[in-house]
Amino acid sequence: RGMKGKKKNVIKVIIVLLVIGGIFYFAQPWIVYYTGPPRWTYERLCQSVQSGSYWNSARGRALDVDGHLDELKTETVFLNKKIQKLENGLYLLQCDGISEWQTWLVLFNRYPISDAKRDFLLDTMKLKGSDDNVNVEMKSSSYPDERFFGAYLYVVLPSPMQIDDTITLEIDGKEIDIEVETVPDVSENYLRKQG
């Protein structure tokens, strides 16, 4: 009898854990929808924009917020990671690299499951800069089934374009003003002088 009772208890515990896990699995997208994504997702999204060895040219060193040199464990160096909530479920992450032409914008949605299939591939983004009224249309692939991020879209700002105030992003026919700051050119020499 004792063994049977233990088995029943184990089965009950397993069922309870499965129920709790299931509730969290389905509730989590709604929680993120209202609270915004957890901080670790920014780092992961920023890291996944790396596309070559030039990301590593600062050898894992970057200036932190207070201007001190910071040894980073990750290979990818970003001076800045800023998140901007455009509307519920739609976020813009700015990843700034080690020079002004390494600014990436990551537009991603975190809608609950019913709306998570949105694919930015079908959208045309118009990016309007403050200098020379630059108007760049871009399309890019996205990953609509990624559970933690929903669909997301990477945009690298064109290198000649120095943006120092706002750009206008048009998506789904709706214009969204985005504040973008240029990053100072932080080359390896500059880091060496400071160090």
Q: Where do the PLM segments sit?
A:
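N-terminal export/targeting and maturation segments
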Residues: Y25-S99
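Extended, compositionally biased low-complexity polar/Lys-Gly-rich tracts
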Residues: V13, P29-T41, L157-P160, I167, ...
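Short, surface-exposed binding/anchoring microloops in extracellular/periplasmic proteins
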Residues: I83-L122
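Short, low-complexity, Pro/Ser/Thr/Gly-rich segments in the mature regions of secreted, periplasmic
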Residues: E175-G195
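Short, solvent-exposed, Trp/other aromatic-anchored flexible loops in extracytoplasmic proteins
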Residues: P112-D123, K128-E181
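N-terminal Sec-pathway targeting helices
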Residues: G2-I23
